[in-house]
Design a protein with these regions (language model features):
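Extreme N-terminal starter segment of soluble prokaryotic enzymes
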Residues: 1-4
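Conserved N-proximal alpha/beta basic substrate-recognition cap immediately N-terminal to
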Residues: 7-110, 116
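Active-site nucleotide/adenylate-binding loops and adjacent lid/helix of ATP-dependent enzymes
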Residues: 83-170
Length: 170
């Protein structure tokens, strides 16, 4: 058995490499971002890739590669059932509703008009969250309709920066 490991210093791959070395497990270091990644994996039985939720590049690509490889029969970590809802509050909401888990009342909007209408009728304060973001990142306490309307317009127009340095210090 030979495991491919996406080598990313300072991530879980450091521990995976050390483990393989200590246990005599054969592995190969790969770069999942290379166009030749599929070819690079032909002599491997599995792929391990810990991608970071704050990397827009990884978020756009990792799930597609891992799912494609899994569909071809390759063992991957994380697998589709582990990763599809990772750092995805919308996916998590629907999953929790589908299994009947207790859930804080949650509203998701796909149109600005519907969101602004809801904001005009709801009570405050409300917690606004973007789809992604760990910890308190992309979370705002909204105290009134005016503040809500401003955030809704921003969300449906130019959007929010992927990384908010001051917000990450909260």
């Amino acid at each position: 058995m030979k495991i491919a490991i996406h080598n990313s210093r300072g991530s879980f791959s450091d521990r995976w490499i050390a483990y393989c070395d200590s246990k005599g497990v054969e592995y190969k270091l790969v770069d999942c971002y290379k166009d030749s990644i599929i070819q690079d994996l032909t002599d491997c039985d599995g792929l391990m890739w810990h991608f970071h939720q704050n990397s827009p590049r990884a978020i756009l690509f990792a799930k597609q590669l891992l799912f494609s490889l899994e569909q071809s029969g390759m063992k991957v970590f994380p697998d589709f059932n582990t990763v599809w809802h990772f750092d995805d509050k919308v996916g998590q909401k629907y999953l929790l509703e589908a299994i009947g888990a207790p859930l804080v009342p949650t509203w998701i909007f796909y149109s600005k008009k519907e969101a602004i209408s809801w904001a005009g009728e709801t009570s405050y304060p409300k917690v606004f969250k973007l789809r992604g973001g760990a910890g308190s990142q992309n979370v705002r306490l909204v105290k009134n309709y005016s503040q809500a309307r401003r955030l809704i317009r921003k969300a449906f127009n130019r959007g929010f920066a992927a990384y908010d340095p001051p917000g990450s210090l909260k």
